[in-house]
From Swiss-Prot:
Protein name stated in the entry: Glutamine and serine-rich protein 1
Subcellular location: Chromosome
Primary subcellular site in the record, as a coarse category: nucleus
Subunit structure comment from the entry: Interacts with TET1.
Listed PANTHER family: GLUTAMINE AND SERINE-RICH PROTEIN 1, GLUTAMINE AND SERINE-RICH PROTEIN 1-RELATED
Function: Plays an essential role in the protection and maintenance of transcriptional and developmental programs. Protects many bivalent promoters and poised enhancers from hypermethylation, showing a marked preference for these regulatory elements over other types of promoters or enhancers. Mechanistically, cooperates with TET1 and binds to DNA in a common complex to inhibit the binding of DNMT3A/3B and therefore de novo methylation.
Compositionally biased spans, kind Polar residues: 267-297, 971-985, 997-1024, 1449-1478
Modified residues (Phosphoserine): 586, 615, 886, 987, 1211, 1230-1231, 1239, 1348
Covalent crosslink: Glycyl lysine isopeptide (Lys-Gly) (interchain with G-Cter in SUMO2): 1058, 1083
A cellular component term, taken from the record's GO annotations: chromosome
Residues with the N-acetylmethionine modification: 1
Taxonomic lineage of the native organism: Eukaryota, Metazoa, Chordata, Craniata, Vertebrata
Positions bearing Phosphothreonine: 949, 1341
Residues in coiled coil: none
Length: 1735
């Protein structure tokens, strides 16, 4: 496939390389490699490209990346090919082309969407095992995802669409299975990031592309642009980078087109490797270079790729493998191509080489950790970059580099990198810096590279910066990290300097970064760059210490891969390459932070691709503010830069420290930091001088904040830094910058110092941050969106609290805010970005005129407030500098754990998206909801991590558990804070700041997580919830408890925390479900709970969350929770007011969509149990939301976990997937009903089905161990209080204790206090439908034509399918009455989802507007299931599953039912009976009105009947009409006219004629068709034959034929009538004779029989009946007569055209339309005559 695709793309590389290959490659390649994942990704990709002309190719390009990545995971060589193919042929795009086309109208949002989607694939790529899982999930949900993407994006449109698509994807995936959900979460995160990159690119590409282009046009303009975009995309794994590239490309359609084409071309020429080399030289000419260059590197690299590819992939196993895979397989070709290769040689040539390099490097570097680290980073990235840069700078250099790369000498490549670095002082240096970053950055590379290339290409200001960087790089050439930092600063600088250009690239890069981080979730090498690097390094490092990495990978592959492996990898990486790695980390960290920040900033536009779309305005506003702030910051710029440098250095040091938790490396890193400080000042100065104001300030503010953020971000928050930077950049950044300017200068240092203290965390964070960045990119997007949307509010808040914020940010803020942003951003942003944030924010921003209202509503509904709150909280938290410091110290440990857990959260990217959903629904609640998903992923990961990182991150373990709870608690308390802050950001923030500070202080004191809970309040709210959910199965309260636990665990409670974490994790699994459900509920909960909870729930909520859940661990948390609750209540009230004013916020499409999205993941647990009741739709989720936290308490933490798991949708099992999907559908169709306002009503209306669904799902979960939270074998959450009000309430919890708890969501408030077990007696009964022993599934049931019985009508034409993997579950569920998996109606290439419902105690399935693709490999994953249609109610079809396969044809009695006793009815009776005997189609020709309108075409059988009747008598239309009305089941003449007048009948007849012509040409045709069960022509032949036969039998009723006469009529094809004129004229009983002769023939083959024919025979007949005999004869021999006519036609055609093949003759005959139509008319006349005679 790859080869073909590659070859094809080569041929079609020019313009439609992507497009051409798309369709072809689509199904096989991505599907083979990772169909589900690929499909989803493709889908995502689809939307991205659709925005522009280029997008399709890009998409194709990207997808190849994705695909190759997956393929890689699947097959190393395949991946290599795929990667090559991807680069060249854009096979993935091919896959996605239709999707892309489908989403073409979506524009930017789709791009963002695609980006998200890509992110998904990136994540999945990054986690190969996950990738597989992801693939699996997407296998089940790819179609769903695709259609959903399609539907969601189109419905939402704009940025909202993106989030929707993302959420959809996320959720759909997530529904697939917990594991899948996890994978998908990661994927989603990546997707999420991808859109940011794309949007960023799109937004900035216009500017930056132009500068980029102008520069790149020299040699790599297109390349570079592509690089930028693709780099962005690259960051997310190949697919991602392509996507981002796409996004960028879309912006620059023509240029991008060229680039893309070139990219493809270059990729295409991969086989033409030598040319590519030569062309690489040509690379100076950007396009030629690209295409040529790419081919060469590709050719060269593919081998290496294959080799190293396989290795890295395999070695990297999950994270590294995923990353390597992504980078190597998908990313490298696509990513590098896009990102690095694109950068250079248009990434095409270089891309391939770059990609190849990256891949190769990855592979080889993966094998050789240091080389991979360097080469991968450098070689893949750097070299790619270098070649690109060189290409840009020097053709020859590039060639050299390419040669090296091509040579794929890892050393050589490394040398190349070094050489490039040196030879291309900045290009190379940047490249090198980039390189490390580059892979690090494949996101970064893409960023760095792009930056470097962009830098170079962008402006030599960048170049200067880069040059400086290059020197810096040279300085730190020993330590690539420094180069990276240089690169980063340059990058940042460039990004900022080129503002849009660079930012575009950077955005692209950041996205790449984000993606990379996501992709490289395994290692968050320094920041984005370092992270990517470290990821790469991790790839390489793990290769070096592959086992370590693999260990990491193993966990990563479980999802920890992202979280833990990153840390471990980070540790390993620094160890593996302490000098370069450490330096790289530190530099990379700085870079990453700067770059991350830049990226964040740039990503601010994109990074929140959704946010970008949504917050673009705000971003722009922020941009203005930022620029204003930048001006301020330019003053502070140096200081900030210095601080940043220091902070970065510290960060780098911390990064390393945190990364490896290696104090050993800390010194190195610190040395590096010093170096960095030394270098960085230069770099920063250069940056300052060039992009100083924009870039440095942003970098400074962002770097500073981000560094703190990174530090605070702990890996998870590492991405948060991006987010935070994004937030900062959008909102906070301005404020932060201002604050930094104001308090930042002094505090930056303080924060830097704090960072130093936190630096270990920060170092890890950067790594994690990288991934976090990716995730954060997603989260960041949302958060940034939130902030951008809240930017004004936040600005006010920040301005008000900017100093405290700055203080916090700088000191504690780094942790707090980072934590907030990280944890919140991570998840919120993902969630928000994915859908809620982007959609809600964007939508609300557009819809709501009041920003504050929007913020409040969004905060409450979308989690915007959480972000705002995050900021305000972080401000407050920052105010508590001491807190911040202590917190930061504490958080170092905590952060480390958080990194792990955060990373896990990140790993649970799906959770993040869910968080986003949750966030969009309810800042807090949504966050909490989201957290469960991460919890799911993270939970396992966390547990593994806890196990895995005990030595390294015992705190991490504790932190994970603690952080999880802390996050949850924080979110719970922060939710209110956030909401309140969102609502009263300006006024309340100050007041809240103290509260938050207090709360935060308490939390800080409680646990390092505390800071998280403060800043994490928002961040943790979402992110931390996720973390909390992830880390601690507990949803929110666990977070606080976790904080306390963390504190305790740090001392020695790690084990207990771990246990709790495990419980929490379990809970989180459940929570995920609930969260998924809760998402939808969040909004309603927001409204209804605002009302209900405000009074009872305030205390209860606070208590349950803070006290109940936290009490076990720390009362202080509960207090802060209380405050948070109060704030939340306020926010909720505000939101409620807003919603009341503007219902669309909560009820409109947004709410609906949010619900839908939420339902998709079904893994969100509400932050506040109180909110849980709101959404009936996803009881499980709501339940999770409500009481995941209470479960946190050690004793009941597991138990509550089942609460979360109550939905059972989170369970990895297919059933859970189905249930989640069902719930999702439920939510989707009930989302409007379940508005918070009338959640009770909604609950009543939906609760029964939901409860039944939940009950069934619970049962299934139990039986199938599908339970998510109850992942603990015994813990099966039977509580399926799916009632929106009692989401949590109805949850039956069979946690580890296996005790069933039912937390009544309705009693959420009270249940919040104490998850009261709700009686599930009623619910279960409601949830169970009457059992059905057997299910009619094709191949699983008897094929006898037995009547299936039961109500409903069986329609042969309507095909329903069920997933093969779900069949057993399905049967079991129907038997037990539980909720079965969904079934799907086949609609051409789509599957429409039908979700189970219970109506009148019967299990029925209702149509939804969720669709999956149904083509390629997907068709082999489903089996037909027989259903009967019950009714069409509320515009929904309801069907039931048959217990036995229904008869093909309706029973004769039905058919022969005579509507009227007219003559036609008489004839219709026989006809009907005859029809029955003949075939369903012919049998069913019911006598209907001959009117054309009589039967709607949908009912084919009716059509057939019409056909039949019309053919029977065309001449008696009126009679037919009258008779047909009543005689629907009779096959009387009436159909004929109507039927014959239908297009369907004409087509049928045409096919009939075609077959007869074929038979006339080749008598064996018929036998061959019958043997092969032809479905194209045979059915038409049978239909016509059936009609003829039915009419003939009708005539027989009127003709009492003598047997011998009958035999003669049927034997002889020729009939002559002999009459006596006199008698005939007189009309007497004249005796007429009929003479029959002719040669007998075989009725099947129509060949003349060889047997001697009897002599002609004559029969005397009644003259009045002669016509009937003649009609009977004509009907009987009609086929033969037409056959003879066909022979004549064929002979006439052959005379005119000799030497024609059969096909051509058939076509020529059929082209004679008049001939065919004449025959059709005669056929109609014949049937009409029959009808007339029989009527």
């Amino acid at each position: 496939m790859n080869f073909l695709s590659t070859a094809e793309s080569r041929t079609a590389q020019a313009a439609a390389s992507g497009t051409t290959l798309l369709p072809q490659f689509r199904a096989p390649s991505w599907q083979t490699g990772m169909h589900s994942s690929a499909a989803t990704e493709l889908f995502a990709t689809g939307p991205l490209p659709s925005t522009g002309t280029l997008p399709p190719s890009l998409s194709a390009y990207q997808h190849p990346t994705t695909f190759s990545n997956r393929n890689f995971a699947t097959t190393s060589p395949l991946v290599l090919q795929d990667s090559t193919f991807n680069t060249t042929s854009n096979g993935i795009l091919s896959h996605h082309d239709p999707l892309l086309q489908i989403k073409t109208s979506q524009g930017t949002v789709p791009t963002a969407l695609a980006f998200e989607r890509l992110g998904s694939s990136v994540l999945s790529n990054s986690i190969p095992p996950q990738s597989s899982t992801y693939r699996s999930a997407q296998e089940s949900a790819p179609h769903l995802l695709q259609p959903q993407f399609s539907l969601l994006p189109s419905a939402l449109g704009g940025s909202q669409q993106t989030p929707q698509a993302y959420s959809s994807t996320l959720f759909t995936s997530s529904t697939a299975s917990i594991e899948r959900a996890l994978l998908r979460e990661c994927s989603v995160i990546k997707h999420h990031q991808r859109p940011s990159g794309t949007q960023s690119i799109q937004a900035q590409l216009t500017g930056s592309q132009h500068s980029l282009h102008s520069y790149l046009s020299n040699s790599s303009v297109v390349n570079f642009q592509e690089t930028t975009r693709q780099s962005s995309l690259s960051c997310s794994p190949i697919g991602d980078s392509t996507q981002v590239s796409n996004g960028g490309l879309q912006q620059k359609t023509s240029q991008v087109s060229v680039e893309l084409a070139q990219s493809y071309s270059s990729a295409i020429p991969s086989s033409g490797y030598p040319p590519s080399t030569t062309k690489i030289k040509s690379c100076s000419t950007e396009q030629p270079l690209t295409s040529t260059k790419t081919p060469k590197p590709q050719s060269i690299i593919p081998p290496v790729q294959t080799l190293s590819y396989s290795k890295p992939l395999h070695n990297q196993s999950s994270v590294i493998s995923g990353q390597a895979q992504i980078y190597s397989t998908a990313q490298l070709p696509s990513l590098l191509s896009v990102s690095q290769s694109q950068n250079y040689g248009l990434v095409q040539p270089h891309n391939v080489p770059s990609i190849v390099h990256s891949q190769v490097y990855r592979s080889s570097k993966v094998e050789k950790l240091p080389p991979l680290y360097k080469t991968l980073t450098f070689s893949g990235s750097s070299q790619t970059v270098t070649p690109e840069n060189q290409t840009l700078n020097y053709s020859s250099n590039q060639q050299e580099v390419l040669s090296s790369v091509t040579n794929e000498n890892y050393p050589a490549q490394t040398r190349d990198l070094s050489s490039v670095s040196q030879s291309q002082s900045y290009s190379s240096g940047h490249s090198q810096g980039l390189s490390p970053v580059s892979q690090t950055q494949v996101s970064y590379s893409s960023q760095s590279q792009v930056l470097s290339v962009v830098s170079l290409s962008e402006s030599y200001a960048s170049g200067e910066s880069l040059t400086l960087t290059a020197p810096s790089l040279s300085y730190s050439s020993a330590s690539r990290a420094q180069n990276l930092p240089d690169s980063s600063p340059t990058q940042n600088y460039i990004s900022m300097h080129s503002s849009q250009n660079v930012q575009t690239q950077e955005s692209s890069s950041p996205q790449s970064q984000k993606f990379l981080p996501a992709v490289q979730s395994s290692s968050f090498a320094s920041s984005t760059h370092c992270q990517t690097l470290q990821n790469n390094i991790t790839s390489p490092d793990p290769k070096s210490y592959a086992e370590r990495k693999l260990d990491s990978d193993v966990y990563p592959s479980s999802k920890q891969e992202d979280g833990f492996p990153m840390q471990e990898l980070q540790v390993l990486q620094p160890q593996a390459s302490l000098e370069s790695s450490t330096q790289r980390l530190s530099d990379g960290e700085i870079n990453a932070q700067e770059s991350t920040y830049k990226v964040s900033k740039a990503d601010d536009r994109y990074s929140q691709s959704v946010i970008r779309s949504n917050s673009r305005l705000e971003d722009q506003v922020i941009g203005v503010a930022l620029q204003a702030s930048k001006k301020e910051e330019s003053v502070v710029g140096s200081v900030t830069q210095l601080n940043q440098q220091i902070g970065q250095v510290n960060n780098a040091a911390t990064l390393d420290l945190k990364n490896s938790t290696n104090l050993i490396q800390t010194p190195q890193i610190r040395l590096n930091t010093k170096d960095l400080k030394q270098q960085h000042p230069l770099i920063l100065k250069v940056h300052e001088s060039k992009v100083q104001e924009q870039h440095d300030q942003i970098i400074n503010a962002s770097s500073q904040i981000q560094i703190p953020n990174h530090a605070l971000g702990h890996g998870h928050q590492a991405s948060l830094p991006n987010t935070q930077v994004l937030l900062d950049s959008a909102c906070d950044l301005q404020i932060l910058q201002q604050s930094i300017l104001q308090a930042g200068l002094g505090q930056v240092k303080a924060s830097l110092q704090a960072q130093r203290v936190q630096s270990p965390q920060q170092i890890v964070h950067p790594f994690l941050q990288m991934e976090g960045h990716v995730i954060q990119s997603n989260g960041d997007h949302s958060q940034q969106q939130l902030h951008p949307q809240n930017s004004e509010v936040m600005k006010m808040d920040l301005s008000e609290s900017s100093k405290p914020l700055q203080q916090h940010l700088t000191t504690k803020g780094h942790f707090s805010e980072t934590n907030q942003h990280d944890s919140k951003n991570q998840f919120v942003s993902l969630g928000s970005m994915c859908f809620p944030e982007a959609v809600l924010l964007s939508d609300e921003r557009n819809i709501l005129s009041n920003v504050d209202d929007i913020l409040a509503a969004t905060a409450a509904a979308c989690g915007v407030t959480p972000t705002d709150f995050s900021k305000s909280t972080s401000n407050e938290t920052m105010q508590a500098v001491e807190d911040g410091d202590s917190k930061s110290h504490f958080q170092q440990s905590l952060d480390v754990r958080h990194v792990t857990s955060d990373f896990n959260s990140m790993t649970a990217t799906v959770g993040k998206p869910q968080n986003i959903n949750d966030t969009s629904l309810n800042g807090n609640q949504v966050t909490v909801n989201l957290s469960p998903v991460p919890a799911l992923q993270s939970k396992m990961t966390l547990d593994q991590q806890h196990i895995e990182t005990p030595g390294q991150n015992i705190p991490t373990k504790v932190t994970s558990a603690v952080v999880g709870p802390s996050h949850e608690v924080q979110e719970q308390s922060s939710g209110p804070f956030k909401k309140q802050s969102a609502t009263n950001l300006e006024s309340e923030e100050d007041s809240e700041a103290p509260v938050d500070s207090t709360l935060n202080n308490n939390r800080n004191q409680e646990f390092v997580s505390s800071s998280r809970s403060i800043s994490g309040e928002n961040a943790t709210s979402e992110s931390e919830f996720t973390l909390g959910g992830d880390d601690s199965g507990v949803s929110m309260n666990p977070a606080r408890s976790a904080l306390a636990l963390l504190a305790m665990a740090q001392s020695g409670d790690a084990v207990s925390v771990k246990i709790e974490e495990e419980n929490q994790d379990l809970m989180h699994f459940n929570l995920q479900k609930k969260r998924a459900k809760g998402k939808g509920q969040v909004k309603e909960e927001d409204n209804s709970n605002q009302k209900q909870l405000k009074r009872p729930a305030q205390g209860k909520r606070q208590n349950p969350r803070g006290t109940d859940i936290y009490l076990p661990y720390t009362p202080p948390s509960s207090e802060s929770c209380h405050d948070g609750y109060q704030h939340q209540e306020k926010m909720r009230q505000k939101i409620k007011e807003v919603e009341e004013k503007q219902p669309e916020v909560k009820t409109g499409f947004i709410a609906s969509f949010l619900d839908f999205l939420k339902s998709g993941p079904k893994q969100q647990f509400s932050t506040l149990a109180v909110r849980m009741p709101n959404r009936t739709r996803r009881p499980g989720t709501q339940m999770v939301r409500t009481f995941c936290p209470p479960p946190l308490p050690k004793p009941s933490s597991t138990t509550p976990t089942p609460l979360v798991s109550e939905t059972g949708g989170n369970s990895p099992s297919d059933k859970v997937d189905n249930e989640l999907k069902n719930l999702e559908h439920l939510s989707s169709f009930s989302s409007d009903e379940d508005d918070p306002g009338y959640s009770q009503d909604a609950y009543k209306s939906v609760s029964t089905p939901l409860t039944t669904l939940d009950a069934t799902s619970d049962k299934k979960k139990k039986t199938e161990a599908l339970q998510v939270a109850t992942t603990s074998p015994t813990a099966n959450t039977t509580g399926t209080a799916t009632t929106s009000s009692t989401t949590v309430g109805a949850v039956k919890q069979e946690p580890l204790h296996s005790t069933s708890y039912a937390v009544n969501i309705l009693e959420n408030i009270s249940s919040s206090e104490s998850s009261k077990p709700i009686e599930l007696d009623g619910l279960p009964s409601d949830q169970f439908a009457k059992g059905q022993d057997t299910v009619a599934i094709e191949g699983f049931t008897d094929e006898e034509d037995t009547e299936s019985g039961g109500e409903g009508q069986y329609r042969e034409r309507d095909e329903f399918v069920v997933k093969i993997e779900d069949i057993e579950t399905f049967k079991e569920a129907l038997k037990t009455g539980k909720e079965p998996p969904a079934i799907w109606k086949v609609q051409k290439a789509l599957l429409q989802k039908f979700v189970p419902e219970i109506r009148d105690g019967q299990r029925e399935f209702a149509a939804t507007n969720s669709y999956l693709g149904y083509f390629g490999d997907a068709k082999s994953k489903y089996k037909r299931i027989y259903v009967k249609f019950i009714e069409n109610a509320n515009k929904k079809e309801y069907v039931r599953v048959c217990s036995k396969k229904p008869r093909n044809k309706p029973s004769q009695t039905i058919r022969t039912v005579q509507a009227k006793p007219s003559s036609s009815s008489k004839t219709s009776d026989p006809l009907a009976s005859k029809t029955t005997t003949t075939k369903a189609p012919s049998v069913k020709p019911k006598v209907k009105q001959p009117k054309v309108k009589a039967e709607p075409p949908p009912k084919k059988r009716k059509k057939w009947k019409e056909e039949f009747s019309s053919s029977q008598s065309d001449s008696s239309p009126e009679i037919h009409t009258s008779s047909s009305d009543d005689e629907e089941f009779e096959p009387p003449a009436p159909f004929v006219t109507r039927f014959l007048n239908t297009r369907a009948m004409k087509e049928t007849f045409k096919s009939y004629m075609e077959l007869l012509v074929s038979i006339a040409l080749d008598p064996d045709t018929m036998q061959a068709l019958e043997k092969s069960n032809d479905e194209l022509l045979l059915p038409h032949m049978k239909k016509i034959d059936g009609m003829l036969n039915d009419n003939r039998k009708r005539l027989l009723l009127n003709l009492h034929l003598d047997q011998s006469f009958k035999n003669a009529l049927e034997s002889f094809p020729e009939l002559t009538i002999i009459t006596r004129d006199s008698k005939a004229k007189s009309g007497g009983t004249a005796i007429s004779k009929i003479k029959m002769n002719g040669k007998a023939y075989n009725k099947k083959t129509l060949r003349t029989s060889k047997t001697t024919t009897k002599s002609a025979q004559e029969f005397a007949v009644d003259p009045e009946k002669i016509q009937l005999y003649s009609l009977y004869h004509s009907l009987h021999h009609y086929k033969y007569h037409v056959y003879l006519i066909c022979k004549d036609e064929i002979s006439s055609v052959q005379k005119k055209n000799e030497d024609l093949g059969q096909e051509e003759i058939v076509q020529l005959c059929m082209k004679n339309v008049k001939w065919v139509e004449d025959l059709f008319e005669k056929f109609g006349e014949l049937l009409n005559h029959v009808q007339q005679k029989c009527s």
